[in-house]
């Protein structure tokens, strides 16, 4: 029995079933905030300097910011990630899926604070990380996508509703693009 099984025995009752649905509802709410009250989006971002000054809601509210600002893209994102996320949850179980998503959220917050500390102690400046576009929720959707591709590599999806393509090839393209960004980007891109 590994540590995750032991943890599930102790904390499994606290798992949130259908977590993907709640994440996607959060994206839709965040999208609505972006278009109905655009000045409020600045209060949702993950900004370590402001969190350290007492705006602790930012530790959670950044998850509401959707990875896209286009309505059509949001609709397709919701449809695609609903099916991918629920399939992962059915495969792993609610508890393990929750651990996967929440550990990703936690490590993102830790990485952001690490990046903030790097800029603060190395250069003596407080860099507004969300303003320069380093912090977002794109990793959540991509981590779900890559996990699904790892578990179901031969599953075919219809790219643009026309071209059948296996998940492993889509994941490979994404990994190559992410690797290119990692090699050619600055420290902010590497941490993100």
Model-derived regions: residue spans:
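A detector for small-residue-rich transmembrane helices and their helix-helix packing motifs
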Residues: 1-192
């Amino acid at each position: 029995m590994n540590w995750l099984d032991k943890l599930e025995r102790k904390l499994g009752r606290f798992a949130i079933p259908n977590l993907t649905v709640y994440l996607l509802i959060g994206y839709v709410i965040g999208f609505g905030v972006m278009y109905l009250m655009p000045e409020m989006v600045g209060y949702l971002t993950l900004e370590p300097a402001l969190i350290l000054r007492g705006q602790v809601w930012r530790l959670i509210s950044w998850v509401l910011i959707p990875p896209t600002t286009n309505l059509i893209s949001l609709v397709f994102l919701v449809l695609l990630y609903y099916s991918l996320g629920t399939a992962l949850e059915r495969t792993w179980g609610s508890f393990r899926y929750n651990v996967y998503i929440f550990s990703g959220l936690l490590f993102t917050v830790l990485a952001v604070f690490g990046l903030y500390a790097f800029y603060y102690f190395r250069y003596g400046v407080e860099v507004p990380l969300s303003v320069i576009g380093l912090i977002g929720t794109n990793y959540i959707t991509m981590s779900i996508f890559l996990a699904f591709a790892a578990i179901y590599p031969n599953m075919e999806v219809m790219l643009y509703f026309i071209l059948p393509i296996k998940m492993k090839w889509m994941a490979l393209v994404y990994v190559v693009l992410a690797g290119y960004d990692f090699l050619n980007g600055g420290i902010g891109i590497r941490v993100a």
